[in-house]
Swiss-Prot record:
Single GO MF annotation: structural constituent of ribosome
Biological function: This is one of the proteins that binds to the 5S RNA in the ribosome where it forms part of the central protuberance.
NCBIfam families documented for this protein: bL25_bact_ctc, PRK05618.2-2
UniProt protein name: Large ribosomal subunit protein bL25
Pfam families (UniProt xref): Ribosomal_L25p (PF01386), Ribosomal_TL5_C (PF14693)
Species of origin: Bacteroides thetaiotaomicron (strain ATCC 29148 / DSM 2079 / JCM 5827 / CCUG 10774 / NCTC 10582 / VPI-5482 / E50)
This protein's UniProt keywords: Ribonucleoprotein, Ribosomal protein, RNA-binding, rRNA-binding
InterPro entries reported for this sequence: Rbsml_bL25/Gln-tRNA_synth_N, Ribosomal_bL25/Gln-tRNA_synth, Ribosomal_bL25_b-dom, Ribosomal_bL25_C, Ribosomal_bL25_long, Ribosomal_L25_dom, Ribosomal_uL5_bac-type
Entries under SUPFAM superfamilies matching the protein: Ribosomal protein L25-like
Gene responsible for this protein: rplY
GO biological process: translation
HAMAP family: Ribosomal_bL25_CTC
Subunit structure, interactors included: Part of the 50S ribosomal subunit; part of the 5S rRNA/L5/L18/L25 subcomplex. Contacts the 5S rRNA. Binds to the 5S rRNA independently of L5 and L18.
Keyword Oxidoreductase: no
Superkingdom assignment: Bacteria
Length: 196
């Protein structure tokens, strides 16, 4: 898995919630994003610039994040992100510190491979799930999950329960559809003509 470096500055938490809300508003006003690092027994509050998160957030790839908080380096993953409901700005980010001995849960992008039989027959291949949630040690998690669809016929689907990847436990619902070959009008017309 690729890694990306993010630099942050530690911050203290105000005792009263009104002071904390004011402080967070000031951070966002100055182009910063409040962040929290969980794991390893302690919770660390820090601030990162909006630009510092851009390459991590606005990408289809997954990364191990090399966090540098005031010189202290930690490996983490992006756990949660909150956006402003109207402006779509990043409001808050949660990171989770990686423990090399414990498995982590992460969403991994899906890549389809091959030309489906149903597409050759006039159907349309539709990717229903862009990411699948997996559980594994972080050094086993791949950058993407490749699903071969060359066997997929018209009207057929691939479900999460039908997939298996070495060293990964699939957490997503087993009945969730990953991809399907849907009938197009042209394919329905050809099937009706062949049936006459």
């Amino acid at each position: 898995m690729k890694s990306i470096e993010v630099k942050g500055t530690a911050r203290t938490i105000a005792e009263r919630s009104s002071e904390q809300a004011r402080a967070l508003k000031e951070i966002r006003k100055n182009g910063g994003v409040p962040c929290v690092l969980y794991g390893a027994g302690e919770v660390v509050h820090f601030t990162v610039t909006n630009e510092g998160l851009r390459n991590l957030v606005y990408t289809p790839h997954i990364y191990v994040v090399d966090l540098d908080i005031d010189g202290k380096k930690v490996n983490a993953i992006l756990k949660d992100i909150q956006f402003h409901p109207v402006k779509d700005n990043i409001l808050h980010v949660d990171f989770y510190q990686i423990d090399e001995a414990k498995p982590i849960v992460m969403e991994v992008p899906v890549q389809l491979e091959g030309l489906a039989e149903g597409v050759k027959a006039g159907g349309k291949l539709a990717l229903q799930m862009r990411k699948i949630k997996v559980k594994a040690l972080y050094n086993v998690i791949p950058e993407k999950l490749t699903v071969n669809v060359s066997h997929l016929g018209l009207g057929k689907t691939v479900k999460v329960g039908e997939l298996s990847f070495e060293g990964l436990e699939l957490i997503s619902a087993k009945e969730a559809v990953v991809c399907a070959v849907k009938l197009t009008r042209a394919a329905r017309g050809a099937a009706a003509a062949a049936g006459k």
